[in-house]
């Protein structure tokens, strides 16, 4: 149940795909906001603006990154998903109508939806479940771990798939519901276009899913186009075409939206733009639930934070409530737990870091004069940059020579190879787990093999507890793991973040098309308001 594959920083929260020109952004947020709604399209085209290119091919067994999920989740479907339009984690049907789980969490039996076809015309049957899970393992992309524990898939009939795991795993349904989870891929299409790479080349510019839309045109760096699948089994929207143009800076994206050239922007605008759209009669502004947070991680391989005393003092110096309110505003609230909000039902993962700047001030007096430290943030992340500047300014009042520094995403993920090359601490403006099970949070962020433990701050007992807890879903053991890891002083959950979606006034169904697991919309559930 471990993985060293890395996942790119989530969505615009930490996407180093675009640099924000701050003066231009300030200008477009300060004035010129229209209060007259733009006209709805009459040609059946929905336009979703992307901030930066998608970074990886939209192959569901490869893609493990940011805004390209808008393509993956509208062209492919899994057996289950997280339920739309609620603020809690609940598994809902997709291509499986129902399922049964054995008491020991080793056997998962799915009853499949009938009369579903892939975009190449191949019927969706239990054979496709078997081949799709196998392809996930064979391709060995970033989220291969979600199928790595599958021992066998039995297909007693076309509409029944029995998945047996090699060991108990209570998180398996969450793996399948994850936006990065296994999606169903046409076995015929894969075989016909296999080439030498299991159809990976083909799926760079085509799709083989069952979703409401087909990938019809790919212009890397410029635009992606989806076309409605005529034989889709589910709800169809009035939008027969979805265009996803790419913008390389947020001000250009925002201006296009203001003019009506873009229908909606999902999780891409900085919090500094909140006031512009809140209550504006021309636009919708929706704050939708997610599992994501702003996070602080501390680097124990750096001399400044070699001792736990220093790490804990630093975390106590952060005025969490003020920082979240000042920078993130209405899209966030201060986090009170170590996992995502509500992930542990009784709240026993309570975060016990209390703001007390005197602890760091006293510790600073023991340091050599002029001691330096660096707080990092991802390039292009306006929110994280502002938070890093505030944190370092406060540290400077203690005599510590603290500075804030930006790092490109590629460099951030290189730190796991040598944490000494990283900063002393790092602020994630927005990051989250692969799914709604506590294991998918703790393993990813706290285990050095999990993928987003940048500085490899690892506690073996935490890892052992997580690996044991996932077998049965033992919340008490998950909570124990969280408290043990928190005591290392390597981690702080700053805020619970919401997915901020701005859309034209004529666009209806935004909340209904969104679920807590992904910062994306199901385009088939969108419509034009009457």
Where are the predicted features?
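N-terminal lobe/hinge region of extracytoplasmic solute-binding protein
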Residues: 49-101, 134, 208-209
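Periplasmic-binding protein-like
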Residues: 58, 301, 305-343, 386-387, ...
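Surface-exposed binding/hinge segments that line
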Residues: 145-193, 217
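Gly/Pro-rich hinge or "lid" segments in bacterial periplasmic/extracellular proteins
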Residues: 180-235
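Ligand-site clamp/hinge motif
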Residues: 201, 229-275
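Structural transition elements
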Residues: 329-366, 379-386
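Extracytoplasmic/peripheral linker and loop segments enriched in polar/acidic and small residues
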Residues: 404, 410-412, 440-505, 529-530
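Long beta-strand-rich cores associated with HINT superfamily self-processing modules
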Residues: 501-530
């Amino acid at each position: 149940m471990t993985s060293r594959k890395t996942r790119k920083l989530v969505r615009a929260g930490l996407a180093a795909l675009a640099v924000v020109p701050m003066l231009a952004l300030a200008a477009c947020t300060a004035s010129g906001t229209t209060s007259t709604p733009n006209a709805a399209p009459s040609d059946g085209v929905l336009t979703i603006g992307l901030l930066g290119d998608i970074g990886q091919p939209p192959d569901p067994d490869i893609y493990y990154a940011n805004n390209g999920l808008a393509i993956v989740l509208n062209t492919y479907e899994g057996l289950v998903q997280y339920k739309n339009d609620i603020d809690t984690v609940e598994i809902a049907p997709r291509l499986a109508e129902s399922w049964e789980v054995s008491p020991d969490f080793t056997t998962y039996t799915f009853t499949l939806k009938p009369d579903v076809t892939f975009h190449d015309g191949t019927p969706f049957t239990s054979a496709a479940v078997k081949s799709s899970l196998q392809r996930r393992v064979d391709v060995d992309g970033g989220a291969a771990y979600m199928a790595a524990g599958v021992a066998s898939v039995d297909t007693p009939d076309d509409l029944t798939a029995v998945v047996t795991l090699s060991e108990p795993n209570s998180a398996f349904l969450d793996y399948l519901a994850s936006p990065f989870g296994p999606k169903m891929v046409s076995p015929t299409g894969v075989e016909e276009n296999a080439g030498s790479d299991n159809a990976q080349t083909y799926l760079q510019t085509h799709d083989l899913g069952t979703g409401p839309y087909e990938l019809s045109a790919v212009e890397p760096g410029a635009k992606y186009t989806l076309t409605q699948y005529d034989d889709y089994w589910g709800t169809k929207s009035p939008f027969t075409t979805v265009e996803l143009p790419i913008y390389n800076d947020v001000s250009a994206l925002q201006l296009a939206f203001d003019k009506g050239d873009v229908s909606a922007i999902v999780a891409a605008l900085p919090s500094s733009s909140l006031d512009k759209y809140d209550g504006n009669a021309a636009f919708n502004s929706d704050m939708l639930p997610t599992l994501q947070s702003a996070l602080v991680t501390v680097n124990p391989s750096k001399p400044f934070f070699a001792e736990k005393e220093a790490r804990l003092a630093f975390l106590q110096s952060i005025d969490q409530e003020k920082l979240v309110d000042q920078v993130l505003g209405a899209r966030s609230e201060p986090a009170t737990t170590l996992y995502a909000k509500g992930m542990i039902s009784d709240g026993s993962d309570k975060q016990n870091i209390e703001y007390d700047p005197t602890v760091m001030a006293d510790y600073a007096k023991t340091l050599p004069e002029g001691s330096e430290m660096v707080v990092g943030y991802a390039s292009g992340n306006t929110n994280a940059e502002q938070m890093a500047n505030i944190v370092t300014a406060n540290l400077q009042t203690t005599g510590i020579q603290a500075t804030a520094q930006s790092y490109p995403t590629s460099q951030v993920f290189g730190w796991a190879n040598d944490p000494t090359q990283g900063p002393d601490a790092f602020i994630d403006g927005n990051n989250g787990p692969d799914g709604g099970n506590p294991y998918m949070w703790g393993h990813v962020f706290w285990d050095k093999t999990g993928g987003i433990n940048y500085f490899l701050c690892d506690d073996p007992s935490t890892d052992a507890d997580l690996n044991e807890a996932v077998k049965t879903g033992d919340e008490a053991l998950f909570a124990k793991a969280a408290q043990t890891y928190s005591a290392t002083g390597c981690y702080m959950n700053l805020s619970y973040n919401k997915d901020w979606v701005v859309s034209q006034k004529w666009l209806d169904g935004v909340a209904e098309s969104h679920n807590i697991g992904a910062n994306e919309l199901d385009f088939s559930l969108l419509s034009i308001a009457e």
